[in-house]
Amino acid sequence: VLEKHNLPKALVTVVPNPDRALMQELMEQRDYIDVIIPRGGEGLINYVTDNAKVPVIQHFKGVCHLYVDKDANLDKAMALLLNGKTQRTGVCNALEGLVVHQAVAGDFLPKVAEAFKEKGVKVHVNEKGSQYFDGADVISEDAYGEEYLGLEIAIRVVDDFEAAVDHIAQFGSNHTEVICTEDAEKGKLFQRAVDASVVMVNASSRFSDGSQLGLGAEIGIATTKLHAY
């Protein structure tokens, strides 16, 4: 590809030896390396961040949520949920959490249970929402915030908008957060209240993509606010 575009092959170099001692030496070469973008598991990323002397563009997991507000169009919410969770599960912009206002839980979650059963999605849900799912795992508080990268999702039924924002602040990864609501002011409030690179109103989390947003190529998995929209 480089030769096709008249670029030198030396622009891309592979270090064939995975020895961590060599990686440590590489991370200290401030005179020769401008920036490191680690790609791999959380342990590797933590190691590079803690030990590098070269600037690091850090990326972590994508724990994205859909919040279904009391004023949501539930058909729209279902479309956002299924697209965000089941279209492609192993990506950083897939949904890992669903937060539902208690006012619409009785109408929405039985339909979610039926759809997820058909799609084979495993549900982890808090006590308040467990009545709507047969055989669902009742989740403990410390189990929220998991990046499943598969057909699993964590669900929480909340009392109000503020509780939803608090949940996202505690368990989100600042990647992408979505609200489904027909209340325009509530959508704007959500965008101001939630801290994430991309905050969406009535759109799928799967649109959080460098190409889709016109921000250029992606680097790593989730480079926090390097790409913010």
Tell what function each PLM region has:
Residues V1-D71:
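Rossmann-like NAD(P) dinucleotide-binding subdomain of oxidoreductase/dehydrogenase enzymes
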Residues A10-T13, D34-V35, V54-I57, H65-L66, ...:
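Structural motif
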Residues P16, V125-E127, D159:
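Short loop/edge segments at beta-strand edges and connector loops
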Residues L22, Q29-Y32, G40-L44, H59, ...:
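General structural feature for long, well-ordered alpha-helical segments within catalytic domains
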Residues M27-D31, N73, A136-A143, G214-E218:
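Short, surface-exposed amphipathic charged segments that create phosphate/polyanion-binding patches used
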Residues L44-G150, V201:
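ALDH superfamily catalytic-core signature
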Residues S140-Y229:
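Conserved C-terminal structural/oligomerization subdomain of aldehyde/semialdehyde dehydrogenase
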